[in-house]
A protein has these predicted regions:
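Gram-negative outer-membrane beta-barrel transporters
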Residues: 10, 126-129, 141, 146-238
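Residues that define the transmembrane beta-barrel architecture of outer-membrane proteins
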Residues: 1, 31-33, 103-107, 163-167, ...
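Residues on the lipid-exposed face of transmembrane beta-strands in outer-membrane beta-barrel proteins
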Residues: 3-9, 37-41, 99, 109-113, ...
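Transmembrane beta-barrel strands of outer-membrane/channel proteins
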Residues: 18-22, 39, 51-55, 64, ...
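Membrane-embedded beta-barrel scaffold of Gram-negative outer-membrane proteins
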Residues: 42, 83-154
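Surface-exposed extracellular loop regions of Gram-negative outer-membrane beta-barrel proteins
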Residues: 1-26, 30-36, 171-190
Length: 341
């Protein structure tokens, strides 16, 4: 259950928006008030400052594992209500946990600049403080029961509290003329998490991301159009294998002889959490299309395209056991047609 109130104030050069959102999470029996602020100030006719800040909350956690080299699919779970009672921050200070919600504080500041009639620049910097996050507990080695009640929560809880930060800059440059558009988008960000034991980089901590898009139109009524899109993403973190071991089962209990057993199964010995990086991702796609007016109110569109023009091997999946890599789409031509009437 949620509701919000918003008030927008417009002056000669300033737009100010104040809002208050309220969320009631029935599964946890918690209410979360979230004030937010946004503004835009026209410094000149061509240059505008803007910013926003606010409190945010959510009750969903991703059901993926850090033990996978690459996560192919993401599921989501409702946040648990049996979290630890106390959390130790990076400075060694212990604080009591009074809420089961995930909470964050966001701040954004930037500007918009109309450099010329054809060129626009948009630059934003942001910082996000994750005051409280919930994650699956990779440090669990004991059951959470009465027999283990004196053990630390970090060794027995299914889910644990984490904190973290994310900082970054987003830059967008647009160049638009009558027949062609060119877009350049660049993002830099750094994210880290503290789980009460260690600081680590989350699996989505991609330092650099870039998109270059170019579109050109020509012919009668601009019926021809071609475009290129190139995307680059720097390497994502993963937890490497440190080694392998055989799982001795001790099926005969204390009377078994482990020196003569020959187990059929092996297990992975993992290295430091997300301490390695995959290869960089980049890909070029090209497309050309022609719009044909068959008759009044009827048009046909023919598309020819190539995905991954230079056949880059981008990682899709890596097997933990064999280290075999599966790659994403190879060079892939396509042909399509649509009829609109």
């Amino acid at each position: 259950l949620a509701g919000f109130f918003s008030y927008k104030l417009k002056a000669k050069r300033t737009v100010l928006e104040l809002s208050l959102r309220g969320h009631y999470y029935a599964s946890l029996g918690e209410f979360s008030p979230e004030p937010r602020l946004g503004f835009k100030y026209n410094l000149t006719d061509d240059f505008r400052l803007k910013g926003a800040a606010g409190l945010y909350s959510q009750n969903l956690i991703a059901a993926n594992s850090d033990r996978d080299v690459v996560n192919l699919f993401y599921g989501f779970l409702s946040g648990p209500d049996n979290l630890q009672d106390f959390f130790t921050d990076e400075d060694g200070n212990s604080k009591e946990i009074t809420s089961n919600l995930q909470k964050a504080t966001h701040g954004i500041f930037g500007f918009e600049w109309d450099v010329t009639r054809y060129v626009e620049v948009n630059l934003e910097g942001y910082v996000k403080y994750f005051n409280q996050l919930v994650n699956t507990n990779r440090n669990k080695i004991f059951e959470d029961n009465v027999a283990n009640r004196d053990l630390p929560d970090v060794l027995k809880k299914d889910f644990i509290i984490e904190t973290g930060t994310a900082r970054g800059v987003d830059l967008v440059v647009k160049y638009k003329r009558k027949n062609y558009d060119i877009w350049g988008v660049y993002s830099f960000q750094k994210s880290d998490r503290w789980d009460g034991v260690q600081t680590y980089s989350p699996v989505f901590d991609r330092r650099h991301n870039m998109n270059l898009i170019a579109t050109y139109r020509w012919g009668k009524d601009n019926s021809w159009e071609t475009n290129f899109r190139w995307n680059y993403g720097s390497a994502l973190p993963f937890t490497p294998n440190q080694g392998f071991g055989q799982s001795v089962q001790f099926e005969e209990g204390i009377y078994g002889d482990y020196t003569s057993e020959n187990p059929n199964s092996i297990f992975n010995v993992l290295g430091d959490l997300n301490s390695s990086r995959l290869s960089d991702y980049h890909r070029l796609d090209w497309n050309i299309q022609k719009v044909i007016e068959v008759r009044e109110h009827q048009t046909m569109e023919i598309n020819v395209g190539v995905t991954n023009v230079y056949n880059r091997d981008n990682i899709f999946y890596i097997s933990r056991t064999t280290s075999e890599a599966v790659y994403q789409l190879p060079i892939l031509p396509s042909l399509g047609m649509s009829w609109t009437f």
